[in-house]
Structure formats: structure tokens, C-alpha cells
């Protein structure tokens, strides 16, 4: 364990958690990065806080397992929201999301890499499990 980040923006069903107030930066392989967990990437302030640490990358672990209607509503909204954070901050963003079905819930990802211009430069196919490998420049 090299550090801890607590999700800043909680969903209604996450009231059992305490939202985080700190935005630590981490370093691995010479890359300085910060974390925005799932819903955090819908808000400019969390991405800006990462940029303010001097990071070059936002890492976004996500668990977008939702009821089918909600999943369909969000299916094409994840990458545009994340792309906006890249354009606002000039940072790269890597998202790692779940995929598959569990009971009445479904997840389509996306697991992707976005450049500072907000362009998706690598992505796993939606609905397909896999491992995405990308070398940051």
C-alpha cells in the first residue's frame, strides 16, 4: 500500500461511506498520478485537484454495474465525461471498469485510455472482459 484516496463525490446509495477530502498524488514507474473513483470524474473539481498536484495522469477505477435501464442511459456518457476532464486539465486518463451481468444488473465498461485532448486512444470492446495494455508517451 503506497497511499489512500477516498472517493470525493458519493452516490445516494453510498451514504455508509465518508467522502474524502484529500487528493494525494502517487508515483509508479516514473509517472505521477492521482485517482478519481467512478462518479468523481463527473465533476471538474476532482480532476482539477489531481492536476494541482503536478500529476500527468488520472486513474479512474469504476464499478458501473447498474440496472439495465440505467446502464443503457450511461452507456455512451462515461467517455465523454472523462474526456471533458482531460481537456480541462491537460491530463491523461485511464479508466478500469467492470463488464458483464449479475442478476438484474449489467456493466459495459468502458475500460479505456484517453489523451489530454480527450480522445480515446485505446479501449477494450464494450461488454468484453480483457486486459488493456498501453504505453504512455
Roles of regions detected by a PLM:
Residues 1, 22, 110-111, 130:
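Conserved beta-strand and immediately adjacent loop positions that scaffold enzyme active sites
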Amino acid at each position: 500500500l503506497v497511499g489512500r484516496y477516498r472517493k470525493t463525490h458519493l452516490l445516494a446509495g453510498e451514504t455508509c461511506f465518508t467522502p474524502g477530502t484529500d487528493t494525494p498524488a502517487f508515483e509508479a514507474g516514473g509517472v505521477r498520478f492521482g485517482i478519481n473513483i467512478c462518479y468523481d470524474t463527473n465533476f471538474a473539481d476532482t480532476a482539477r485537484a489531481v492536476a494541482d498536484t503536478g500529476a500527468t495522469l488520472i486513474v479512474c477505477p469504476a464499478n458501473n454495474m447498474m440496472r439495465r435501464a440505467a446502464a443503457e442511459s450511461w452507456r455512451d456518457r462515461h467517455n465523454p465525461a472523462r474526456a471533458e476532464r482531460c481537456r480541462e486539465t491537460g491530463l491523461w486518463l485511464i479508466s478500469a471498469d467492470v463488464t458483464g451481468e449479475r442478476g438484474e444488473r449489467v456493466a459495459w465498461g468502458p475500460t479505456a485510455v484517453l489523451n489530454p485532448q480527450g480522445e480515446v486512444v485505446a479501449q477494450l470492446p464494450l461488454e468484453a472482459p480483457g486486459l488493456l495494455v498501453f504505453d504512455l508517451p
